[in-house]
Amino acid sequence: MATDHAAPTASEYIVHHLGHFSTKHQDKIVDFSIINMDTIFWSIFAGVVGCLFMYLAARKATSGVPGRFQAAVEMIVEMVDNQAKSIVHGDRTFIAPLALTVFVWVALMNSLDFLPVDMFSAFFHAVGLDSLITHHRVVPTADLNGTMGIALGVFALMIFYNIKIKGAGGFVHELFAAPFGIWLAPFNLLLNMIEFAAKTVSLAMRLFGNMYAGELLFLLIALLGSTATAFGFFGHVVAGTLWAIFHILIVFLQAFIFMMLTLVYIGQAHESH
């Protein structure tokens, strides 16, 4: 007897898992009316987990011999604070906690990539929601909309600190006068606008590209395991294990790089040309 639903091909499987649970189908390359609900949900979820993580660390903090959890959190806080001290020369009252927030949040969002790729598809099918939630992606940083949103937040902070430190007049003067003098004001303005845009776009694209590639490789490994052969299953287990171990480095390295670039860009606001 024929089955009701034929098994998807490899390309259909990948395309399905790279789709988003959105407010509507995307027909154009750029459509600001579309909201990826899965990206928003998992971003908030990672943020809540991060806040709970730090709250528990603060609650359990002791001046005596720290436990493993407190020691791990203290290592992260000290690492971030040392990086902030070496990069930002000025008041770091807000910047160091900001960098810590960025690192923990991005690391947690990246870590969602370790969840099995078919886990939520199977869950939605089991509870009868597969007809409503036809697509679902778990990793917010594998969505360019998510990384661009964070990068735009960093861009807003760059502008804020430039105005706060140099004053509105000083910031505008720097836009027109640096780096080649006021006589080349139009060229200076264009160059500075390109610099701000390049920083924002590259910050978003770097994180997105690495996490998207990692997610795609996990899908390919899952396809390898779906082959009905002993070799396919063995290759799936070996490749999946090795890539998951290597991906741990990528997850936290990308969070560290994003945090460092955030510090560098905000730290540049404390300097004048």
Swiss-Prot record:
PROSITE patterns linked: ATPASE_A
Subcellular location: Cell inner membrane
Molecular function GO terms recorded: proton-transporting ATP synthase activity, rotational mechanism
GO cellular-component term (any): plasma membrane
Family label: Belongs to the ATPase A chain family.
Function: Key component of the proton channel; it plays a direct role in the translocation of protons across the membrane.
Subunit-structure text: F-type ATPases have 2 components, CF(1) - the catalytic core - and CF(0) - the membrane proton channel. CF(1) has five subunits: alpha(3), beta(3), gamma(1), delta(1), epsilon(1). CF(0) has three main subunits: a(1), b(2) and c(9-12). The alpha and beta chains form an alternating ring which encloses part of the gamma chain. CF(1) is attached to CF(0) by a central stalk formed by the gamma and epsilon chains, while a peripheral stalk is formed by the delta and b chains.
The name this protein goes by in its record: ATP synthase subunit a
